[in-house]
Amino acid sequence: SLPWQHASVTGGRWSGNDTPRVFELRGKTLGIVGLGSIGKKVARLAQAFGMTVTYYDIRRLSEDREDALGVRFRLLDEMFEAADVVTLHVPLNESTHHLINADRLARMQASSILVNTSRGPVVDETALTEALTARRLFAAGLDVFNDEPPAPDNALFALDNVVLTPHLAGPTYESHEARIRNGFDNVQRVARGEAPLWVIPELG
């Protein structure tokens, strides 16, 4: 909603009294695809906003661990049918390429939102564009694309129910410094004959 409202103000139109185009996170269900380190952090943040958190991962946690994190496992298709917001946090490989396809998008509620900050080809971009265009999906937030940078004529650019950013969801001043430190630490580990940490899955 922020980009829309910003454009409204700078365009000379005051839309403060319009019918709201947003919903609260409190009481909604979040579906996390990929409960790695990032997925777990997202779960904690979502719980702070009062969301119910479900997840799908190829390796299910123990029930004790699920209880500690406050999350519940769901099969992927079940999650897509029930979640108000689905967020993706998986690496790109043969099993995740187009994991989110036309069939799974069709399972989502028309009021739901898809967020992808993992890798572009995890989502069938053509199928997503069609779902958004037909309003079978309320909105999407994409930080990644099938081709980066996307072509100027990408059909997503013409839609008003999608927010697009140039693969920068992670970088901050602090994270940039941490990446430099981690890279230096990895070089030292390898020089000592130890296994590196923070290996990129696609390159591992």
Predicted regions and their residues:
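Gly/Ala-rich phosphate-binding loop of Rossmann-like dinucleotide-binding domains
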Residues: 43, 47, 132-133
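Short, flexible hinge/linker loops that cap or flank conserved catalytic cores
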Residues: 22-26, 47, 106-107, 156
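Residues at the starts of beta-strands that form the adenosine-phosphate
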Residues: 48-52
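Glycine-rich NAD(P)-binding loop of Rossmann-like domains
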Residues: 5-41
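C-terminal helix-to-coil terminal segments
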Residues: 5-8, 15-16, 21, 147-204
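Short, glycine-/small-residue-rich phosphate/pyrophosphate-handling segment
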Residues: 1-8, 136, 142
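Rossmann-like adenosine-cofactor binding region
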Residues: 58-155
